[in-house]
C-alpha cells in the first residue's frame, strides 16, 4: 500500500512538472524570451524533482518492473536535460533569457511518453 502511494505521488509530481514545462515552452515560443527568475525557479524545481525521483526509484527498486524502471529513468533524464537547458541562454540582458525551445519541446515529449508509460502500467495493475 505504501509503495502504491509513493508511485501515485511520483506520477502526480511528474504530471505537474509536465504542465509547468508545457506552459513555459508555450510562453517562450510566444514571447521569444523568458525572465531569468522564471527560468531559475523552474530549473530548481526540476533538479529537486529529479533528485527525489532518483532517490525514490532506488527505494522502490524491488517493487518496479523493467518497464516502470525504464520510464522513471527516462523521466529523470528529461527533467535533468530541461533543467540544464534552462541554465543556458543568458546573453546581454541580465533579466531575460532565451533558452532553446526545441530542446525543451524534446524534453516535454520525452517526459510525456514516460508519464504515459507509467499511467498505462498503473492501469494494468489495477485491472
From Swiss-Prot:
It comes from Escherichia coli (strain K12). It holds the Pfam family YliH. The gene is bssR. Disruption phenotype: Cells show increased biofilm formation when glucose is present in the medium. In a continuous-flow system with M9C medium supplemented with glucose, the biofilm had a 290-fold greater biomass, a 2700-fold greater thickness and a 31-fold increased surface coverage than the wild-type. Disulfide bonds: none annotated. InterPro entries: Biofilm_regulator_BssR. GO terms for biological process: regulation of gene expression; regulation of single-species biofilm formation. This is Biofilm regulator BssR. Represses biofilm formation in M9C glu and LB glu media but not in M9C and LB media. Seems to act as a global regulator of several genes involved in catabolite repression and stress response and regulation of the uptake and export of signaling pathways. Could be involved the regulation of indole as well as uptake and export of AI-2 through a cAMP-dependent pathway.
Amino acid at each position: 500500500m505504501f509503495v502504491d502511494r509513493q508511485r501515485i505521488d511520483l506520477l502526480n509530481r511528474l504530471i505537474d512538472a509536465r504542465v509547468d514545462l508545457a506552459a513555459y515552452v508555450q510562453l517562450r515560443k510566444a514571447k521569444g524570451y523568458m525572465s531569468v527568475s522564471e527560468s531559475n525557479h523552474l530549473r530548481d524545481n526540476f533538479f529537486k524533482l529529479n533528485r527525489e525521483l532518483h532517490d525514490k526509484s532506488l527505494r522502490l527498486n524491488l517493487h518496479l518492473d523493467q518497464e516502470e524502471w525504464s520510464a522513471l529513468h527516462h523521466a529523470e533524464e528529461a527533467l535533468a536535460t530541461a533543467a540544464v537547458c534552462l541554465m543556458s541562454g543568458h546573453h546581454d540582458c541580465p533579466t531575460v533569457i532565451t533558452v532553446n525551445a526545441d530542446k525543451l519541446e524534446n524534453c516535454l515529449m520525452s517526459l510525456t511518453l514516460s508519464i504515459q508509460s507509467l499511467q498505462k502500467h498503473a492501469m494494468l495493475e489495477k485491472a
